[in-house]
Amino acid sequence: TDILAHLRDWQICASIDGTGAVGEYIRTGLKWEQFLQNYKDAQAIQTNDRLMRLDFTLTLPGLFEVENMFWLSKELNTQILAKVTFAFSPDIVMSPLSLPRHILEPYVSSVLERIKPHADKHQQPLVDVLEQLLNRPTLEEQWPDEYADGMRRGKERILTLESIRTQPITMAEILKQNLEIYEWWNRIEVKN
């Protein structure tokens, strides 16, 4: 903020994938409390509310952060931009589209029921992305013949990364927040 205060024109889109430990899991190196304080410090010197935005990338573990991000946007009175993790092959298990339709749709719909009535112009982009997600083809629908093998490879990649990283939580622990999603994750068989 010591530099920003002396600039005439500036803008920050803070790329963030979640709050707290889940945000730190998704984006290695994030220190949530420090990020939040830095964001608030910069907000204190902004001259209008379009100078700072939260840029939220929706991931599979980030599904459990949608409501936290929504309410953070309200608390900070800041716009949240939103997009979904690219899903360009059937092994992108970090995409929420890796979930089968019968699991994805009710989960996203229930989140929308809770947040949509409270949305204003700052949260509407997040609501829009969630509504669009319901109409996008899942990985299983896009690659029916390759889906099972893709999920196996994607899960193996996640487990390999988790064995290297030093984070206190795992994908499985995050997904435990929803029994159906957790059971789906556990059914993905990996090679030993």
Regions flagged by a language model, labelled:
Residues T1-A87:
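Radical SAM/AdoMet-radical enzyme domain recognition
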Residues L58-L63, L81-E113, Q123, V127-E140, ...:
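Flexible glycine/acidic-rich beta-alpha junction loops that bind and position SAM and/or redox cofactors
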Residues N68, L72, A82-F86, L97-L99, ...:
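Hydrophobic transmembrane signal anchors and adjacent membrane-proximal interface regions, especially
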Residues I3, K40, I103, Y107, ...:
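Intrinsically disordered, low-complexity regions enriched in Ser/Pro/Gly/Gln/His and often acidic
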